């Protein structure tokens, strides 16, 4: 039990630090190990979601003035609808093939954006927002990792890193809240999840403080390449685990 508490605490520090520094990645970081210490995969995604939601809430309170709702609401509503549907079929999913496809996709996307990001200009049109929200909803519902599609949209559409961080965290806060309700309805919000949250919340606060300091010293261009690199590493991690 003591080892599990320590693991949850350290995982929460690392995941919160990544989220605060890059604007995403809490689920990607913590879900590499969390399923191995939780009773079920559904409970692991639920705990990851509420810890990530807490991280996002802290950031939204700090960055609220940078939110532009007209660029946020279409992708957010699409994400909520798709992710809830994905959660309802979670118990019937076969993860082996999906993990391989997810890993390959993340690697290809990260390489493409790293080399061609200067040529890519994402327009905030409804089709683009719906597409990003759909992909994000599928990844969030199945894997608890809704970040990459939404992040690639926001990092290209937002004028600076402050707007980027405000938009991503508001998106993740609302999305994780709705997914948590859906997971609770499906029986994934258990006593074990509640206890895990108590153990992890201190780590979330510490990781957020450290990440906030690092974020202030990052340039916008460097932040983009860190994001692309982390997406690629996440994809490689999926392939190796599979």
Language-model regions, residue ranges each:
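Small-residue-rich hydrophobic segments that form or flank transmembrane alpha-helices
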Residues: 4-73, 133, 137, 147-201
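Membrane-interface helix caps of multi-pass small-molecule transporters
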Residues: 17, 21, 33, 37, ...
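Transmembrane alpha-helical core positions of polytopic small-molecule transporters
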Residues: 23-24, 79-83, 141-145, 175, ...
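Membrane helix-loop-helix hairpins that form the core translocation module of multi-pass transporters
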Residues: 43-115
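Hydrophobic alpha-helical transmembrane segments in multi-pass integral membrane proteins
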Residues: 44, 85, 89-90, 95, ...
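Interfacial helix-loop-helix linkers and transmembrane-helix boundary segments
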Residues: 60-74, 90-100, 120-124, 189-195, ...
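Selective transmembrane alpha-helices of multi-pass membrane proteins
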Residues: 79-87, 95-115, 199-212, 220-242
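Alpha-helical multi-pass membrane helix bundles of inner-membrane/thylakoid proteins
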Residues: 113-136
């Amino acid at each position: 039990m003591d080892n599990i508490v320590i693991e949850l605490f350290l995982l929460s520090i690392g995941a919160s630090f990544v989220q605060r520094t890059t604007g995403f990645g809490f689920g990607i970081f913590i879900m590499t190990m969390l399923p191995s210490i939780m009773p079920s995969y559904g409970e692991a995604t639920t705990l990851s979601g509420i810890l990530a939601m807490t991280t996002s809430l802290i950031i939204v309170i700090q960055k609220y003035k940078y939110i532009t709702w007209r660029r946020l609401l279409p992708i957010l509503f699409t994400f909520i609808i798709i992710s809830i549907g994905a959660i309802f079929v979670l118990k019937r999913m076969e993860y082996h093939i999906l993990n391989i496809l997810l890993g390959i996709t993340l690697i290809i996307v990260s390489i493409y954006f790293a080399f061609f990001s200067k040529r890519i200009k994402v327009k905030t049109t409804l089709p683009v927002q719906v597409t990003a929200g759909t992909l994000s909803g599928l990844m969030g519902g199945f894997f608890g990792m809704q970040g990459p599609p939404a992040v690639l949209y926001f990092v290209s559409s937002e004028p600076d890193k402050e707007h980027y961080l405000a938009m991503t965290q508001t998106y993740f806060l609302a999305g994780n809240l709705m997914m948590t309700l859906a997971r609770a309805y499906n029986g994934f919000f258990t006593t074990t999840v509640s206890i895990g949250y108590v153990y992890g919340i201190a780590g979330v606060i510490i990781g957020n403080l450290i990440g906030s300091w690092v974020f202030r010293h990052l340039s916008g261009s460097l932040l983009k390449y860190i994001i692309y690199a982390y997406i690629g590493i996440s994809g490689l991690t999926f392939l190796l685990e599979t």
